[in-house]
Design a protein with these regions (language model features):
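A short, structured active-site edge motif that brings together acidic residues
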Residues: 21-37, 41-60
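Short catalytic/ligand-binding loop motif for oxyanion handling, primarily in non-cytosolic enzymes
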Residues: 20-22, 29-33, 61-62, 73-76, ...
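Acidic, Mg2+-coordinating phosphoryl-transfer loop and its flanking beta/alpha structural elements
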Residues: 67-101
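Charged phosphate-binding loop/patch that engages nucleotide di/tri-phosphates or the phosphate backbone
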Residues: 9-12, 50, 87-109
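Conserved Lys-Pro-Asp/Glu-containing loop-to-beta segment of HAD-superfamily phosphomonoesterases
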Residues: 50-78
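Short, acidic loop-to-helix structural element flanking the phosphoryl-transfer center
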Residues: 1-22, 29-34
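A structural signal for isolated positions on well-ordered beta-strands in alpha/beta enzyme cores
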Residues: 19-21, 65, 82
Length: 109
């Protein structure tokens, strides 16, 4: 799987300024966990394994912000909800959009 353009630079800078966690609802496919962890370690080596949260449902996550490409993950989140634009979510317009990682950087850095 390819890394989204500018994601590594932006996440690295965010990590220097904020408490960043990568949350994945990967439990639906538990056999994918080792590959996901390996991929994250390879492409985001500046993140510590304690910053990775694998869960069955993202509604258990609390924080100030959540960036996600799936609207249903944002609906129950109590903080600010940011929808990362993807082909499968173009019909949703009730969340603030982040169209790319440069926009994420502009918002937070």
């Amino acid at each position: 799987m390819e890394v989204n353009e500018h994601s590594q630079e932006v996440v690295k800078k965010l990590n220097e300024k904020y408490d960043v966690f990568i949350v994945s609802s990967a439990m639906e496919f538990p056999n994918s966990l080792p590959e996901k962890l390996e991929w994250l370690g390879e492409h985001f080596p500046f993140l510590h394994w304690k910053q990775f949260v694998f869960c069955g449902n993202k509604k258990v996550v609390h924080g100030d912000y959540m960036i996600d490409d799936l609207p249903h993950n944002l609906e129950t989140f109590n903080g600010e909800k940011l929808l990362f634009t993807a082909p499968h979510n173009m019909q949703f317009n009730h969340f603030q959009r982040m169209n790319n990682w440069k926009e994420v950087g502009e918002k937070f850095l």
